[in-house]
A protein has these predicted regions:
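Polytopic endomembrane small-metabolite transporters, centered on the Drug/Metabolite Transporter
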Residues: 1-350
Length: 350
């Protein structure tokens, strides 16, 4: 008898190692993207707040111009990403941009509506952070979860589960507690604070509604067409820069003619602009590599960091027990909204 030959397990082991390596890389990318999201969200809010309240000689930078520059930087970043997807070939890049943007004018025009709304939202965030401390802004801005959910139900016919509806109720209660007036201030300071807080709150609320509508509208466009998210962001940035420039000349034309487009710009201003430009790209990466629960964790961590830094560094915020209670409710609602209960498996029959 001839000895039987054993089949080698090397191909199987090699395939298993390759799969494990791929899973490890995916996990690393997931947590890397979430870490970047926490850093970007927290640092943008804090630096924007600091830049709008910092007392300096000369004119303050125009927030409307910062929005335009952020849109232009976003276009540049997305073009570089399309270039990477085109295997770093300029001819391929040129063909892709020509075919997907210039040759499809009606598809490109679809982005005009969400782009205009996003431009309004970005300007409102500067107004909000000029009148609210970073911690209060961060917590209140989570109302965009509510508006996004409602627009998803009405525009995309999305069905929400019991946990999601419950989370929206908890979210509204949490934001109400966060906005609860404090009795610790003097009457004069309290009156001034109430006025500016009302302006900031209105700016955040309008930004939440605009964010919810534009986000769902953009999602609908992405689902109905096959264009890449980077191409769509280039189209958004194109219209955003046009609408932004219109806003600059309509609302800040007089100051612009006196002191120029880049009046009041310094290193901190450029940090704010770059962070704002990268925001959409970071969100896209998180959507690709992470899930809603981890995104909720990142948002919660960002709120906590903003609260601590506002108290210890900016010193423009004194947390109360009511604020903490409201913040805990908002964080819990964020987790609950992303919670996806898995149905119990069928019992094994004997």
């Amino acid at each position: 008898m001839y000895p039987t030959r054993r089949m080698s397990n090397k191909p199987k082991n090699k395939s298993k190692r390759k799969e494990e390596k791929s899973q490890e890389m995916s996990t690393n990318l997931k947590y890397l993207s979430l870490s970047i999201l926490v850093f970007q969200t927290t640092s943008l809010v804090l630096t924007m707040r600091y830049s709008r309240t910092l007392k300096e000689e000369g004119p303050r930078y125009l927030s409307s111009t910062a929005v335009v520059i952020a849109e232009l930087l976003k276009i540049l970043a997305c073009v570089l990403l399309v270039y990477k997807d085109s295997k770093c070939n300029l001819r391929t890049l040129n063909r892709v941009l020509h075919d997907e943007i210039l040759n499809k004018p009606m598809e490109t025009l679809k982005l005009a509506i969400p782009s205009g709304i996003y431009t309004l939202q970005n300007n409102l965030l500067y107004v909000a952070l000029s009148n609210l401390d970073a911690a209060t802004y961060q917590v209140t801005y989570q109302l965009k979860i509510l508006t996004t959910a409602l627009f998803s139900v009405s525009m995309l016919s999305k069905k929400l589960g019991v946990y999601q509806w419950l989370s929206l109720v908890i979210l509204m209660a949490g934001v109400a507690f966060v906005q609860w007036p404090s009795d610790s201030q003097a009457p004069a300071a309290k009156e001034h604070s109430a006025g500016s807080q009302f302006v900031g709150l209105m700016a955040v609320l309008i930004a939440c509604f605009s964010s919810g509508f534009a986000g769902v509208y953009f999602e609908k466009i992405l689902k109905e067409t096959k264009q890449s998210v980077w191409i769509r962001n280039i189209q958004l940035g194109f219209f955003g820069s046009i609408f932004g420039l219109m806003g600059v000349y309509i609302y800040d034309g007089e100051q612009l003619s006196k002191n120029g487009f880049f009046q009041g710009y310094n290193k901190l201003t450029w940090v704010v602009v770059v962070l704002q430009a990268l925001g959409g790209l970071v969100i896209a990466a998180v959507i690709k590599y992470a899930d809603n629960i981890l995104k909720g964790f990142a948002t919660s961590l960002s709120i906590i960091l903003s609260t601590l830094i506002s108290y210890f560094w900016l010193q423009d915020f004194v947390p109360t027990s009511v604020f903490f209670f409201g913040a805990v409710l908002v964080i819990a609602a964020t987790f609950l909204y992303g919670y996806d209960p898995k149905p119990a498996g069928n019992p094994i029959k004997a």
